[in-house]
UniProtKB/Swiss-Prot annotation:
Mn(2+) binds at residues 13, 201, 203, 237. Residues 4-266 form the Pyruvate carboxyltransferase domain. Homodimer. PANTHER family: 2-ISOPROPYLMALATE SYNTHASE 1, CHLOROPLASTIC-RELATED, HOMOCITRATE SYNTHASE-RELATED. SUPFAM superfamilies: 2-isopropylmalate synthase LeuA, allosteric (dimerisation) domain, Aldolase. GO terms for cellular component: cytoplasm. It comes from Bacillus licheniformis (strain ATCC 14580 / DSM 13 / JCM 2505 / CCUG 7422 / NBRC 12200 / NCIMB 9375 / NCTC 10341 / NRRL NRS-1264 / Gibson 46). Catalyzes the condensation of the acetyl group of acetyl-CoA with 3-methyl-2-oxobutanoate (2-ketoisovalerate) to form 3-carboxy-3-hydroxy-4-methylpentanoate (2-isopropylmalate). One of its GO terms (molecular function) is acetyl-CoA C-acetyltransferase activity. This is 2-isopropylmalate synthase. The keyword Cytoplasm applies. It is an enzyme of class 2 (transferase).
Length: 518
């Protein structure tokens, strides 16, 4: 049976979702979970785009040992050199290099001839092979490229030393039959195509990214590039979890398997959703809240008699827990530590003690802690960047039905250690809090989106707030978790501003939006 390699690009193409900017600790948390998930390759970022991305890729490459870590590079020596410096300490350094090949890109973006592009592609693959043991070459906009020219340039980069050739549907244009045909054509017409791995990379502009990826596998693709929850540029990318489960459930049809640990899918999906602030639609295949719900009376009757009447995927297969065991104020440190280990957290004794003390303090207000509560609490602490921006100290809100809401906020400037305290009013309590935060930070911040959800049912559930803001023409997303909605709202807003400041500090040179090469 064929083995399909999974190339995960959540940390590169997924992070290009508008309003998403992950800090190094958040990227590292996702990378470690992707390693547990069993991906074969993870694309950690675009090292040449900014010092922040470079440092994150370098840290991930040093940490991850059980899969190959790669970075994106344009077909220029500076990008390749930067990627090598970031990736050279990894277990299996790999480069993902790209250049556009379609006539529309050549004419309007690159302003080069086919001959010039072919020459540049070959020269840069050769240059990359002087450093990297594995080089993947991508033909940006392959699906709108003249097929004879595509076969020619693929032949030449293979001769130059490329180990993997990626044929991306960069704009999500093709139907599955058309995309599959490209793989057949390249296999039949590109010289030595059988000596390299062919890779698929699909965008979801017409809603066919997963179908196209599976069509590529049917027609000889050895590797599939995908993203957790299908997030990414514009309408997103092919969803890793959907492809992996489809290969497993329909192994009889695809005759292919992978190393993906399916029982880690739900945990990975939840982590990416929390850290990016991008909620998973309830009706999302495999990981949505409704994926295993049965509403129709006829369906319920059949399901109760025999699950397989209406359920082709069991919740347990993808790691959906049906037992929500909880911790409470009488739970001891041993039970707390055991629960953290079961949730996949590998923490030292000092960290366990720190989180246990926070947990015990909160149980005075909150009767029960579910898995979701603990995950939210720990992620909030572990992924916070404490070096740049503002630290939340306290919040007080005065509200009455016949009064104008007033908020008082105390923050600490993490650069100067100065404590800032301001007060302001608003039409509602949340607006009062946000007007006060603006005063504290003296920044013009426009709120674009505000969402609130609870971890679970019950009046003592944690509130999770996600916001998107605009600062100096740049979008930034933030999240906040607290038992109080207003506190969570303040933390989310502050988190979005801090992310913007981190991005502003680290972004010199290319913006991450320049990295749309595949």
């Amino acid at each position: 049976m064929r083995k399909i390699n999974f190339f995960d690009t959540t940390l590169r193409d997924g992070e290009q979702s508008p309003g998403v900017n992950l800090n190094t600790q958040e990227k590292l948390a996702i990378a470690q979970q992707l390693e547990k998930l069993g991906v074969n390759i993870m694309e950690a970022g675009f090292p040449a785009s900014s010092p922040g991305d470079f440092n994150a890729v370098k840290e991930i490459a040093r940490t991850i040992k059980n899969c190959s870590v790669t970075g994106l590079a344009r077909s220029v020596k500076g990008d390749i050199d930067s990627a090598w410096e970031a990736l050279k300490d990894g277990a299996e350094p790999r480069l993902h290099i790209f250049i556009a090949t379609s006539d529309i890109h050549l004419k309007y973006k690159l302003k080069k001839t086919r001959e010039q592009v072919l020459e540049q592609a070959v020269a840069m693959v050769k240059y990359a092979k002087e450093r990297f043991p594995i080089v993947q070459w991508s033909a940006e906009d392959a699906c709108r490229t003249d097929l004879p020219f595509l076969a020619e340039i693929v032949s030449e980069v293979i001769a130059a030393g490329a180990d993997v050739v990626n044929l991306p549907d960069t704009v999500g244009y093709l139907a599955p039959a058309e995309y599959g045909n490209i793989f057949r054509y390249i296999k039949e017409n590109a010289r030595n195509a059988d000596k390299v791995q062919l890779s698929a990379h699909c965008h979801d502009d017409l809603g066919m990214a997963v179908a196209n990826s599976l069509a590529a596998i049917e027609n000889g693709a050895d590797q599939v590039e995908s993203v957790i929850n299908g997030i990414g540029e514009r309408a997103g990318n092919a969803s890793l979890e959907e492809i992996a489960v489809a290969l497993h459930i329909r192994k009889d049809f695809y005759q292919a398997e992978s190393t993906i640990q399916l029982n880690e899918i739900k945990r990975t999906s939840d982590l990416v959703s929390k850290l990016t602030g991008m909620a998973v639609p309830r009706n999302k295949a495999v990981v949505g809240d409704n994926a295993f719900a049965h509403e129709s009376g006829i369906h319920q009757d059949g399901f109760l008699k025999e699950k397989t009447t209406y359920e082709i995927i069991s919740p347990e297969l993808v790691g959906v827990k049906t037992d929500a065991l909880v911790l409470g104020k009488h739970s001891g440190r041993h039970a707390f530590k055991d629960k953290l280990q079961n949730l996949g957290f590998q923490l030292g004794e000092e960290e366990i003690n720190k989180f246990f003390n926070i947990f015990k303090e909160l149980t005075g207000k909150k009767k029960e802690f579910t898995d979701e509560d603990l995950i939210s609490l720990i992620l909030e602490e572990k992924t916070a960047d404490r070096k740049i921006g503002y630290d939340f100290i306290s919040l007080q809100v005065h509200y009455g039905t016949s009064q104008v809401p007033t908020a008082t906020v105390s923050l600490k400037d993490q650069e100067t250690d100065q404590v800032i305290q301001e007060a302001a009013t608003g039409a509602g309590s949340v607006e009062a809090v946000y007007n006060t935060l603006k005063r504290c930070m003296d920044k013009e911040v426009q709120l674009l989106d505000y969402r609130i959800q609870s971890n679970r049912k019950g009046q003592d559930a944690f509130a999770q707030v996600y916001v998107r803001v605009m600062i100096d023409g740049k979008e930034s997303g933030g999240r906040g978790v607290a038992q109080d909605v207003l506190e969570a709202s303040a933390k989310a807003y502050l988190n979005a501003v801090n992310r913007y400041l981190v991005l502003k500090t680290n972004t010199e040179g290319l913006s991450k939006q320049a990295a749309v090469g595949s």
